[in-house]
Regions:
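N-terminal single-pass transmembrane signal-anchor helix
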Residues: 2-29
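N-terminal export/assembly leader peptides and their processing motifs that target proteins to secretory
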Residues: 26-211
Length: 211
């Protein structure tokens, strides 16, 4: 009897241990699946939110709005998401159809970096130039740009109280470049395509000049 009781006790202990092991396995597996599903939901939502902030540009844009998108993508390309999370950099394609000479961008197709570089070149020669900083405001550049081809440019400089220490010929030349930038901001561009990376995120957007 004593041996039988011992055997039953051992069998009961083994059964309880097995049941506990099964329970632990079930709980752990279920928790893991739940965590994975939750993480997947978060990632899907992140992709949707990311795309939403770019897909809103799928329309006809003014050049000024397109430059806003260029800056947005350029900032993203140097963000921590790209540096540390392994996300792909973004790109943008801009097709210029106007064959008129003397524009900021001549006829052709331009990438995100080439657009950004062209704009930075103009800004560095004008608004951000050390020789003009603190002496010519952004609003004054607008006026100077519009009159950059006028014979009354010097009169405007006097009216705007531009310091006489600034070389007028050089200023006029730089104002011509700024005017090209002003004209570009007024152009219109239609959206012609969006590409996505393997993770479902927007990776490239394409635009073409339109009337």
């Amino acid at each position: 009897m004593e041996n039988a009781a011992k055997a039953l006790s051992i069998a009961g202990g083994v059964l309880i241990a097995v049941m506990l092991a099964v329970l632990v396995y079930y709980v752990f597996t279920h928790w893991g699946d739940s965590q994975r599903a939750s993480q997947e939901d978060i990632e899907i939502q992140q992709v949707e939110d990311f795309n939403k902030s770019y897909l809103s540009y799928e329309k006809v844009l003014y050049g000024s709005e397109l430059l806003g998108l260029v800056n947005k993508m350029s900032d993203y390309n140097i963000s921590d998401d790209v540096k540390y999370s392994g996300y792909s950099t973004m790109n943008l394609s801009m097709k210029i159809t106007d064959r008129t000479t003397g524009n900021l961008f001549s006829n052709g197709t331009y990438s995100l970096s080439s657009i950004s570089n062209a704009i930075n070149t103009v800004m560095n020669k004008t608004v951000n130039s050390n020789k003009y900083k603190g002496q010519i405001s952004d609003s004054q550049w607008e006026y100077l740009a519009k009159s950059s081809t006028s014979t009354k440019f010097n009169d405007l400089c006097t009216e705007l109280k531009i310091p006489s220490s600034i070389n007028r010929d050089q200023l006029k030349s730089d104002a011509v470049e700024y005017y090209k930038y002003v004209q570009f901001k007024r152009k219109k561009f239609k959206h012609i395509g969006t590409e996505f990376s393997n993770d479902g995120r927007v990776s490239k957007m394409s635009f073409e000049e339109t009337n």
